[in-house]
C-alpha cells in the first residue's frame, strides 16, 4: 500500500500560521481587549480614548502571554500588529488631551448616529 500525501495539510500545519489565521486571531483578541477596556472606561468613568490605550495594552499583554504559552509568535502576529496600532492611536489621543487640543486624533463613536 502506497502512502499518498494530502494536497492540503491539516490544521496546525503550515496554513495555521499564514495571514488569514493570524488576522482572525488578531481581530478576535482585539475585540476581547476592547470589550475589557470599554468595561474599564464605564467602571471608572474615564475618557473613552483612554480606553483605546488600555485596550492596546491589554491586547499586547494577552498576545505576549499566548505567545509564551504556545512558543509560537507566528500565530499571533496579527494580534501584535493590532495592539501596536491601538497603543499608538490611544497614546496620540492621550497626548492631545493633555496638550489641551480640542479634538482627539480618532474620536470613537458609541451607538448609532441618526441620519437627517
UniProtKB/Swiss-Prot annotation:
Organism encoding this protein: Acidianus bottle-shaped virus (isolate Italy/Pozzuoli) (ABV)
Residue intervals passing through the bilayer: 20-40, 53-73, 76-96
Protein name: Putative transmembrane protein ORF116
Record's keyword terms, sorted: Host membrane, Membrane, Transmembrane, Transmembrane helix
Membrane topology (UniProt): Multi-pass membrane protein
Keyword Transmembrane helix recorded: yes
Residues spanning the signal sequence: none
Subcellular location: Host membrane
GO cellular component, one term: host cell membrane
Amino acid at each position: 500500500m502506497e502512502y499518498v500525501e494530502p494536497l492540503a495539510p491539516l490544521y496546525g500545519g503550515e496554513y495555521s500560521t499564514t495571514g488569514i489565521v493570524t488576522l482572525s486571531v488578531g481581530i478576535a483578541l482585539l475585540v476581547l481587549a476592547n470589550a475589557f477596556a470599554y468595561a474599564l472606561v464605564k467602571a471608572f468613568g474615564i475618557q473613552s480614548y483612554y480606553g483605546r490605550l488600555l485596550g492596546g495594552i491589554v491586547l499586547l499583554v494577552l498576545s505576549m502571554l499566548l505567545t509564551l504559552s504556545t512558543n509560537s509568535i507566528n500565530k499571533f502576529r496579527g494580534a501584535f500588529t493590532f495592539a501596536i496600532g491601538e497603543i499608538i492611536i490611544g497614546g496620540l489621543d492621550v497626548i492631545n488631551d493633555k496638550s489641551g487640543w480640542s479634538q482627539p486624533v480618532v474620536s470613537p463613536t458609541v451607538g448609532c448616529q441618526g441620519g437627517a
